[in-house]
From Swiss-Prot:
One of its GO terms (biological process) is NAD biosynthetic process. It comes from the Eukaryota. Disulfide bonds: none annotated. Signal peptide: none annotated. The gene is aspdh. This is Aspartate dehydrogenase domain-containing protein. SUPFAM superfamilies: Glyceraldehyde-3-phosphate dehydrogenase-like, C-terminal domain, NAD(P)-binding Rossmann-fold domains. PANTHER family: ASPARTATE DEHYDROGENASE DOMAIN-CONTAINING PROTEIN, L-ASPARTATE DEHYDROGENASE-RELATED. Belongs to the L-aspartate dehydrogenase family. InterPro entries: Asp/hSer_DH_NAD-bd, Asp_DH, L-Asp_DH, NAD(P)-bd_dom_sf. One of its GO terms (molecular function) is NADP binding. It comes from Xenopus tropicalis (Western clawed frog).
Length: 284
Protein backbone atom coordinates (compact mmCIF):
# COMPACT_ATOMS: atom_id res chain seq x y z
CA UNK A 1 0.00 0.00 0.00
CA UNK A 2 1.39 3.42 -0.95
CA UNK A 3 2.14 5.91 1.80
CA UNK A 4 -0.63 8.46 2.42
CA UNK A 5 0.15 11.85 0.93
CA UNK A 6 0.94 14.45 3.56
CA UNK A 7 -0.76 17.83 3.61
CA UNK A 8 1.85 20.53 3.08
CA UNK A 9 1.58 23.53 5.42
CA UNK A 10 3.12 26.95 4.81
CA UNK A 11 3.46 29.13 7.92
CA UNK A 12 3.62 32.90 7.46
CA UNK A 13 4.95 34.53 10.61
CA UNK A 14 7.33 33.21 13.25
CA UNK A 15 6.20 34.95 16.40
CA UNK A 16 4.88 33.07 19.43
CA UNK A 17 2.04 31.29 17.60
CA UNK A 18 4.03 30.76 14.41
CA UNK A 19 6.92 29.14 16.26
CA UNK A 20 4.48 27.00 18.24
CA UNK A 21 2.82 25.75 15.04
CA UNK A 22 6.10 25.09 13.26
CA UNK A 23 7.42 23.10 16.21
CA UNK A 24 4.17 21.11 16.45
CA UNK A 25 4.20 20.28 12.74
CA UNK A 26 7.84 19.18 12.89
CA UNK A 27 7.26 17.01 15.98
CA UNK A 28 3.75 15.70 15.40
CA UNK A 29 2.91 16.43 11.77
CA UNK A 30 3.50 12.88 10.58
CA UNK A 31 0.85 11.67 13.03
CA UNK A 32 -1.66 13.91 11.26
CA UNK A 33 -0.42 13.32 7.70
CA UNK A 34 1.06 16.80 7.39
CA UNK A 35 4.47 18.38 6.86
CA UNK A 36 6.02 21.82 6.54
CA UNK A 37 6.07 23.34 3.07
CA UNK A 38 7.72 26.62 4.05
CA UNK A 39 8.16 29.19 6.81
CA UNK A 40 8.30 32.95 6.20
CA UNK A 41 9.09 35.74 8.62
CA UNK A 42 9.57 39.45 8.05
CA UNK A 43 12.86 39.31 9.95
CA UNK A 44 14.63 36.38 8.33
CA UNK A 45 17.38 36.28 10.93
CA UNK A 46 14.82 34.97 13.43
CA UNK A 47 14.62 31.76 11.39
CA UNK A 48 18.37 31.22 11.42
CA UNK A 49 19.26 28.10 13.37
CA UNK A 50 15.58 27.44 14.11
CA UNK A 51 14.15 26.44 10.73
CA UNK A 52 15.74 24.28 8.03
CA UNK A 53 17.15 26.71 5.42
CA UNK A 54 15.50 24.63 2.69
CA UNK A 55 12.11 25.53 4.16
CA UNK A 56 12.70 29.26 4.51
CA UNK A 57 10.61 31.25 2.02
CA UNK A 58 12.20 34.59 1.18
CA UNK A 59 9.49 36.25 -0.92
CA UNK A 60 5.77 35.70 -0.30
CA UNK A 61 5.13 36.41 -3.97
CA UNK A 62 6.80 33.06 -4.69
CA UNK A 63 4.58 31.04 -2.35
CA UNK A 64 3.02 29.08 -5.22
CA UNK A 65 6.40 27.49 -6.00
CA UNK A 66 6.37 25.66 -2.66
CA UNK A 67 3.22 23.65 -3.43
CA UNK A 68 1.52 24.23 -0.08
CA UNK A 69 -1.94 22.77 0.46
CA UNK A 70 -2.67 25.15 3.33
CA UNK A 71 -1.13 28.54 4.09
CA UNK A 72 -1.40 29.81 7.67
CA UNK A 73 -0.99 33.53 8.35
CA UNK A 74 0.08 34.36 11.91
CA UNK A 75 2.05 37.52 11.22
CA UNK A 76 0.00 40.72 10.93
CA UNK A 77 -3.28 41.83 9.32
CA UNK A 78 -1.35 43.70 6.62
CA UNK A 79 -0.06 40.37 5.30
CA UNK A 80 -3.59 39.10 4.78
CA UNK A 81 -4.63 42.36 3.14
CA UNK A 82 -1.68 42.28 0.75
CA UNK A 83 -1.27 38.57 0.03
CA UNK A 84 -4.56 36.94 1.03
CA UNK A 85 -5.86 36.70 -2.53
CA UNK A 86 -2.55 35.25 -3.68
CA UNK A 87 -2.63 32.64 -0.93
CA UNK A 88 -6.21 31.61 -1.71
CA UNK A 89 -5.47 31.30 -5.40
CA UNK A 90 -2.95 28.51 -4.71
CA UNK A 91 -4.06 26.89 -1.42
CA UNK A 92 -6.53 26.83 1.42
CA UNK A 93 -5.90 29.81 3.68
CA UNK A 94 -6.13 29.98 7.49
CA UNK A 95 -6.22 33.67 8.41
CA UNK A 96 -4.77 34.05 11.88
CA UNK A 97 -5.29 37.82 11.83
CA UNK A 98 -9.00 38.07 10.98
CA UNK A 99 -9.03 41.74 12.04
CA UNK A 100 -7.85 42.25 8.45
CA UNK A 101 -11.35 41.27 7.34
CA UNK A 102 -12.80 44.37 9.02
CA UNK A 103 -11.72 46.11 5.84
CA UNK A 104 -14.73 45.64 3.57
CA UNK A 105 -12.66 45.48 0.40
CA UNK A 106 -10.38 42.79 1.83
CA UNK A 107 -13.28 40.68 3.07
CA UNK A 108 -15.09 40.91 -0.27
CA UNK A 109 -11.97 40.06 -2.26
CA UNK A 110 -11.13 37.03 -0.15
CA UNK A 111 -14.68 35.71 -0.21
CA UNK A 112 -14.73 36.04 -3.98
CA UNK A 113 -11.28 34.48 -4.41
CA UNK A 114 -12.35 31.51 -2.28
CA UNK A 115 -15.45 31.08 -4.43
CA UNK A 116 -13.52 31.23 -7.69
CA UNK A 117 -10.59 29.05 -6.61
CA UNK A 118 -12.56 26.45 -4.69
CA UNK A 119 -10.15 26.88 -1.79
CA UNK A 120 -11.42 27.48 1.73
CA UNK A 121 -10.94 30.68 3.72
CA UNK A 122 -10.56 29.38 7.27
CA UNK A 123 -11.17 31.64 10.27
CA UNK A 124 -9.90 30.20 13.58
CA UNK A 125 -12.30 30.69 16.48
CA UNK A 126 -9.44 31.30 18.94
CA UNK A 127 -10.89 32.46 22.25
CA UNK A 128 -14.45 32.59 20.85
CA UNK A 129 -16.42 30.06 22.87
CA UNK A 130 -19.53 28.83 21.05
CA UNK A 131 -18.50 29.98 17.57
CA UNK A 132 -20.30 27.11 15.85
CA UNK A 133 -23.54 27.83 17.73
CA UNK A 134 -23.34 31.52 16.85
CA UNK A 135 -22.84 30.59 13.20
CA UNK A 136 -25.83 28.24 13.27
CA UNK A 137 -28.03 30.96 14.76
CA UNK A 138 -26.93 33.35 12.02
CA UNK A 139 -27.72 30.72 9.39
CA UNK A 140 -31.21 30.21 10.86
CA UNK A 141 -31.83 33.94 11.10
CA UNK A 142 -32.36 33.80 14.87
CA UNK A 143 -29.26 35.77 15.93
CA UNK A 144 -30.39 39.23 17.01
CA UNK A 145 -27.40 40.62 18.90
CA UNK A 146 -23.86 39.73 19.93
CA UNK A 147 -21.68 41.57 22.43
CA UNK A 148 -18.11 40.62 23.32
CA UNK A 149 -16.16 42.13 26.21
CA UNK A 150 -12.42 41.52 26.34
CA UNK A 151 -10.46 42.42 29.48
CA UNK A 152 -6.67 42.41 29.78
CA UNK A 153 -3.89 44.10 31.70
CA UNK A 154 -2.77 47.39 30.08
CA UNK A 155 0.61 45.86 29.21
CA UNK A 156 -1.07 43.06 27.26
CA UNK A 157 -2.39 45.44 24.62
CA UNK A 158 -0.75 46.56 21.39
CA UNK A 159 -2.83 49.54 20.38
CA UNK A 160 -3.00 52.27 17.76
CA UNK A 161 -4.39 55.79 17.57
CA UNK A 162 -6.28 57.35 20.47
CA UNK A 163 -6.35 54.09 22.42
CA UNK A 164 -2.62 54.32 23.15
CA UNK A 165 -3.07 57.33 25.42
CA UNK A 166 -6.26 55.96 26.98
CA UNK A 167 -4.48 52.73 27.83
CA UNK A 168 -1.53 54.54 29.40
CA UNK A 169 -3.97 56.35 31.65
CA UNK A 170 -5.48 53.00 32.68
CA UNK A 171 -2.39 51.80 34.57
CA UNK A 172 -4.04 52.56 37.91
CA UNK A 173 -7.77 52.11 37.23
CA UNK A 174 -10.00 49.77 35.24
CA UNK A 175 -10.90 51.63 32.04
CA UNK A 176 -13.22 50.93 29.12
CA UNK A 177 -11.04 51.76 26.13
CA UNK A 178 -13.70 51.19 23.48
CA UNK A 179 -17.35 50.23 23.17
CA UNK A 180 -19.03 50.06 19.80
CA UNK A 181 -19.03 48.24 16.45
CA UNK A 182 -16.10 45.86 16.06
CA UNK A 183 -15.29 47.34 12.65
CA UNK A 184 -14.13 50.55 14.30
CA UNK A 185 -12.04 48.71 16.88
CA UNK A 186 -10.03 46.41 14.60
CA UNK A 187 -7.72 49.12 13.18
CA UNK A 188 -7.06 50.39 16.71
CA UNK A 189 -6.21 46.98 18.21
CA UNK A 190 -5.29 44.77 15.23
CA UNK A 191 -3.36 42.22 17.30
CA UNK A 192 -5.72 42.07 20.27
CA UNK A 193 -9.25 41.60 18.97
CA UNK A 194 -8.98 38.67 16.58
CA UNK A 195 -11.54 36.90 18.76
CA UNK A 196 -14.02 39.68 18.06
CA UNK A 197 -13.23 39.58 14.35
CA UNK A 198 -13.84 35.82 14.29
CA UNK A 199 -17.16 36.46 16.02
CA UNK A 200 -18.14 38.89 13.28
CA UNK A 201 -17.43 36.27 10.63
CA UNK A 202 -19.42 33.63 12.54
CA UNK A 203 -22.26 36.09 13.16
CA UNK A 204 -22.33 36.98 9.48
CA UNK A 205 -25.86 38.40 9.59
CA UNK A 206 -24.61 41.06 12.02
CA UNK A 207 -21.08 41.39 10.68
CA UNK A 208 -18.44 43.86 11.78
CA UNK A 209 -20.96 46.70 12.02
CA UNK A 210 -23.54 44.79 14.05
CA UNK A 211 -21.39 42.95 16.59
CA UNK A 212 -20.55 45.14 19.60
CA UNK A 213 -17.03 44.98 20.99
CA UNK A 214 -15.98 46.25 24.42
CA UNK A 215 -12.27 46.53 25.21
CA UNK A 216 -11.36 46.88 28.88
CA UNK A 217 -7.93 47.66 30.32
CA UNK A 218 -7.64 46.41 33.91
CA UNK A 219 -4.38 46.58 35.92
CA UNK A 220 -5.75 44.12 38.49
CA UNK A 221 -5.49 41.14 36.07
CA UNK A 222 -1.78 40.87 35.17
CA UNK A 223 -1.88 37.19 34.23
CA UNK A 224 -5.38 36.60 32.85
CA UNK A 225 -7.31 37.33 29.66
CA UNK A 226 -11.09 37.53 30.11
CA UNK A 227 -13.61 37.15 27.28
CA UNK A 228 -17.31 37.58 28.07
CA UNK A 229 -19.81 36.79 25.35
CA UNK A 230 -23.48 37.77 25.33
CA UNK A 231 -25.70 36.28 22.63
CA UNK A 232 -29.29 37.39 22.09
CA UNK A 233 -31.71 35.37 20.02
CA UNK A 234 -35.36 35.55 19.14
CA UNK A 235 -38.35 36.56 21.25
CA UNK A 236 -41.43 34.42 21.90
CA UNK A 237 -44.31 36.67 20.88
CA UNK A 238 -46.86 35.30 23.33
CA UNK A 239 -44.69 35.56 26.43
CA UNK A 240 -42.06 38.13 25.52
CA UNK A 241 -39.34 35.72 26.63
CA UNK A 242 -35.97 36.24 24.93
CA UNK A 243 -33.40 33.54 24.22
CA UNK A 244 -29.94 34.46 25.51
CA UNK A 245 -26.57 32.90 26.29
CA UNK A 246 -23.75 34.32 28.38
CA UNK A 247 -20.31 32.75 28.62
CA UNK A 248 -17.18 33.83 30.48
CA UNK A 249 -13.77 32.57 29.42
CA UNK A 250 -10.85 32.91 31.83
CA UNK A 251 -7.59 32.25 30.02
CA UNK A 252 -4.31 32.20 32.00
CA UNK A 253 -1.66 34.35 30.35
CA UNK A 254 1.95 35.28 31.00
CA UNK A 255 2.35 38.87 32.24
CA UNK A 256 2.37 41.37 29.36
CA UNK A 257 1.47 38.62 26.89
CA UNK A 258 -0.83 39.41 23.97
CA UNK A 259 -1.78 35.74 23.59
CA UNK A 260 -3.27 33.61 26.37
CA UNK A 261 -1.97 30.10 27.00
CA UNK A 262 -5.09 28.25 25.86
CA UNK A 263 -5.07 30.09 22.53
CA UNK A 264 -2.06 28.10 21.29
CA UNK A 265 -3.83 24.75 21.64
CA UNK A 266 -6.98 26.23 20.15
CA UNK A 267 -5.05 27.36 17.09
CA UNK A 268 -3.52 23.92 16.64
CA UNK A 269 -6.99 22.38 16.78
CA UNK A 270 -8.15 24.86 14.15
CA UNK A 271 -5.26 23.91 11.88
CA UNK A 272 -6.11 20.22 12.19
CA UNK A 273 -9.64 21.00 11.01
CA UNK A 274 -8.43 22.53 7.74
CA UNK A 275 -9.05 19.57 5.47
CA UNK A 276 -10.76 21.41 2.62
CA UNK A 277 -14.37 22.60 2.83
CA UNK A 278 -14.89 24.05 -0.63
CA UNK A 279 -14.78 27.63 -1.88
CA UNK A 280 -16.27 29.38 1.12
CA UNK A 281 -15.60 30.81 4.57
CA UNK A 282 -15.36 28.19 7.31
CA UNK A 283 -15.10 28.88 11.05
CA UNK A 284 -12.79 26.33 12.68
Amino acid sequence: MSEERRMRIGVVGYGHIGKYLVDKIVREGANHSMELAFVWNRRREKLSGAVDPRLQLQDLSDCQKWAADLIVEVAHPCITREYGEKFLSVAHFLVGSPTALADTVTEAKLRERARLSGNTLYVPCGALWGAEDIFKMAERGTLKALRITMTKHPNSFKLEGDLVQKNQEAMSNRTVLYEGPVRGLCPLAPNNVNTMAAACMAAHTLGFDGVVGVLVSDPSVPDWHFVDIEVTGGTIEKTGQVFSVKTSRRNPAAPCSVTGSATFASFWSSLLACKGHGGRVYIC
